[in-house]
Amino acid sequence: MPAELSPIDTAKFAAARRAVDLVQDGMKLGLGTGSTAAWMVRCLAERVREEGLRVQGVPTSTRTAELARALGIQVVTLDEAKWLDLTIDGADEFDADFNLIKGGGAALLQEKIVATASDRMVVIADAAKEVAHLGAFPLPVEVIPFGWQSTKMLIEETLEGMDVLGREVTLRLSGDAPLLTDEKNYILDLHLKRIGEPRQLGLALNQIAGVVENGLFIDICDTVVVGHGDGRVSLRDLQSGQAEEGCIDMDRARNIFADLGD
């Protein structure tokens, strides 16, 4: 166990810890996927253990489900929960309007389904994830394996008419083979550099035969919690205009630190 957290882990913990403060007893929660979301699951488990907090968690990936169960959080399916009070998840990028790119962890389909079945979505991130324009991070698109190369060609053709700076499309690999999502689909990464009209692009991509879902989350995120390497944390809510600043007790992080993976 490291004696001190790195600045990036400090930022992730700070955001996760503040977001978990929003959880109330009896809530049904969407549990995100990724390294920042893993911090959130551990912070939530700490409240369950120490406060007797009663929650049900709907995980957005197999690895999140495994972590939540191992830490004593009650895990249910979305069909069992039906509707969620709150989803907390990370993001690869977010802009001033809280539009997101997600899917770096290849869980974008379940993440979007869970987020849109929630009263509120809270994104947790370090400050580096905030951008003026989406697109520096590759945009993941989940596609059916059957005919994926034809789907790729159709995506490339669609990009010709879009307000983007790059148009390279690559198949995401795991070793020498295509990476498989939890639904056994492939991921195509779109290297766009800058996305001028995220809403237009998201709608166009989902019209292509073979595309299951894309990693643009538009009008889904309500609140962003941003952590910093010194333990400072800010919360911004899009609807209410609420903005607050604070600082997290980093001794709490050291007490629950473990190998989170991603």
From Swiss-Prot:
Listed CDD domains: RPI_A
A biological process from GO: pentose-phosphate shunt, non-oxidative branch
Pfam families cross-referenced by the UniProt entry: Rib_5-P_isom_A (PF06026)
Class of enzymatic activity (EC top level): isomerase
Entry annotation: catalytic residues: 111 (proton acceptor)
List of residues binding substrate: 33-36, 89-92, 102-105, 129
EC code(s) of this entry: 5.3.1.6
GO CC annotation: cytosol
GO MF, any single term: ribose-5-phosphate isomerase activity
Record's keyword terms, sorted: Isomerase
Pathway terms, separated by semicolons: Carbohydrate degradation; pentose phosphate pathway; D-ribose 5-phosphate from D-ribulose 5-phosphate (non-oxidative stage): step 1/1
Top-level taxon: Bacteria
Catalytic activity: aldehydo-D-ribose 5-phosphate = D-ribulose 5-phosphate
Family designation: Belongs to the ribose 5-phosphate isomerase family.
UniProt function note: Catalyzes the reversible conversion of ribose-5-phosphate to ribulose 5-phosphate.
Annotated PANTHER family: RIBOSE-5-PHOSPHATE ISOMERASE
Oligomeric and partner information: Homodimer.
Protein name: Ribose-5-phosphate isomerase A
Lineage per the UniProt record: Bacteria, Pseudomonadati, Pseudomonadota, Alphaproteobacteria, Rhodobacterales
Protein encoded by which gene: rpiA
